[in-house]
């Protein structure tokens, strides 16, 4: 076995021969990362990405200064979708090591699940993976129900059924109940709703190749909220939380939905489909109706919903939308505590009316007259949240996945958002 490369930390600048802005230096003992106090976690993550790029696949984090957050920053940059990597971790106290191990278990699960090819991860497989993960960490405190195919239509889940019926792989709704109280009548504290589109071709509003080639990741919202619930449980979550995953392929076939179709939802809303590539909101609507029926204190939905959010924020931040200023502030505080990037974008009452249809109450996409696509998408979802002005957060997961490597990240999934949502659930 290859001997591990030692990685140490220093608060002293690198020797001038390495350059004025050098973040690491190499000597006979290994590699030293030179912290400057400005953005130490980011520096460690960027250095780890460079170390991986050197082809070094076995490292030992050695010496003073390592804690769980710094170890985790290293792993975020070091991990990649190809090949294997081995890290020998430094000595940490029990609490720090447990936190690190939990992150490695859950957030790596999220990243690996999002990175999985669509051929391997269809709607049923995604739902079952979520069940397996939560059951593994929660045991008998979990019950669940999986509804699929024509049963969805018969039970009124018309958005999910409509989007998913064009694929040979049946659409699936996972309804999972984490109830640590043992009381079947216990109130539901929170509901998590995730978009689980396991491949998105755009349907008849078909995507170009450059926009379709990463669409195995369109289930990133479902993976994120699943990971968040699992991580919160491992952090001691003692309140009842329900998880709803809306899983489907969005494909073209003789049975696929078409432009001009009208979907009638269980809450009476009628939606005209004018863009089959705006399918995520159609499936989330079913999950939000179920979540609202639980009367929880809060509803959090997560979805790789719009390109508009990425246009605004790039892949560097998740976009947050809410009418509830206090709850939005709590999530942003959780994000700050967990060192995860969230940014609040506008959501106002007028966004709810910017989806006009000549044939139904709502259009599933805004017209050219209303170009704030991420905000109008959130406005659409609000029509399916019973008390949308309080206790509801919508996360447009623009930071979930990167098509190409950058300074801090390999190509693929990031796992960002899991810790923030878990923090909010356990606060």
Swiss-Prot record:
InterPro entries, per database record: Leucine_aapep/pepB, M17_PepB-like_N, Pept_M17_PepB, Peptidase_M17_C
Keyword Metal-binding listed: yes
EC number, as in UniProt: 3.4.11.23
Annotated binding of Mn(2+) 2, by residue: 195, 200, 218, 279
Coarse class of the protein's main subcellular location: cytoplasm
Gene3D superfamilies: Zn peptidases (3.40.630.10)
Function: Probably plays an important role in intracellular peptide degradation.
Full protein name: Peptidase B
Lineage: Bacteria, Pseudomonadati, Pseudomonadota, Gammaproteobacteria, Enterobacterales
Encoding gene per record: pepB
